[in-house]
């Protein structure tokens, strides 16, 4: 995408590559821009922008900076305080906000942070607006048919208000609870909140639905978000589920837009498992619209084999829940997601929602009266080997004729027993080489073959 904004917002190390000044300028632009849009529509009420944040120490700094920018431009800032990314998307949509902002770096360590921008439909902000924000940050804004070297400041009664809007977060929790069509009474559930945004939401939702809820990593201190916790460090939840004799466990990331599960035996249930389980559940009930589950190119080869066996169609998008949702919206699909646990249920949400995902997995377990291990059993995950090759030129390495010939040779050798995927990293000088095959040795052999070709062509660093 642009200079600052990637597919998941403006992200960087707090105070280094993402500063309070950046956040202030984001607020200044958005407050001014949406007020201008309103004025052009003969609406003279101030723009309304809702803000949420995760538990990082720096999130407070960025929240205050955004509020300063928004109110200086005459917009009203509504604060959800610590909450999840999907809650901001939900409230932005149902409460008719001009846009929403989430302060989070998702699964990254505490010293990183990010600014995610959400439009009035609860979807990721259109790229053209993000590029205007970048232009303003860089002092070269041109919009509404003129250059804007400086933006006007609001004054007197036109300075924006700041509104405590924790009631919005509570209504989001009520919405989640309303989606629980079965009582969870008697079900022992473990939750790993990653010391992040879900710490003050997830347990309340499960308790309200009657579960016996056990929680780990729900004591945020500003520095421990995702620290050996949550969906990227699921081994802690695996141990917890087994030791406590729980029926199921759910692990969220820092802003709770993703979820992975642990079955009653301590096995990890990935995003691919979730797509398979819910896809089959929907098909059985005649509710899998278009008979299609949307995946990304990183989903496991075994998932597609399993879908073929069940007569379920699938689509593959580029990596990123942004691309998954775009395909779903365009083609009327009900479920899609990523192996990492970003799962989108388009009937209920416009973004990945970890807590919603866990509720849907509970629904399938209770409807089918089966433990998670049995629901996941038909999906045979193929062994996978992934190697990141640091290169001098990502595009040249991937387009090289000898490299392409090596990739083609592997694909032909695997046939319908596996697959090879070679792609550029979107954020690093890296080419990723991934092979899935019936056994680990075969994966490693073919990955090594392609990696050595890349290096022998002089692209390796």
PLM region spans:
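An N-terminal, well-structured beta->alpha segment
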Residues: 1-68, 72-73, 162-186, 395-396
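Phosphate-binding and adjacent anionic-ligand microenvironments
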Residues: 248, 285-461
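N-terminal small/polar loop signature for handling phosphorylated ligands or for N-terminal nucleophile
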Residues: 36, 40, 48-112, 204-262
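Proline/glycine-rich low-complexity loops and linkers
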Residues: 80, 131-173, 178, 264-337, ...
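Gly/Ser/Thr-rich active-site loops/lids in small-molecule metabolic enzymes
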Residues: 126, 215, 267-286, 354-364, ...
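Gly/Ser/Thr-enriched, mixed-charge loops and adjacent short helices
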Residues: 13, 113-242
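Short glycine-rich phosphate-binding loop at a beta-alpha junction
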Residues: 42-54, 188-190, 291-297, 432-434
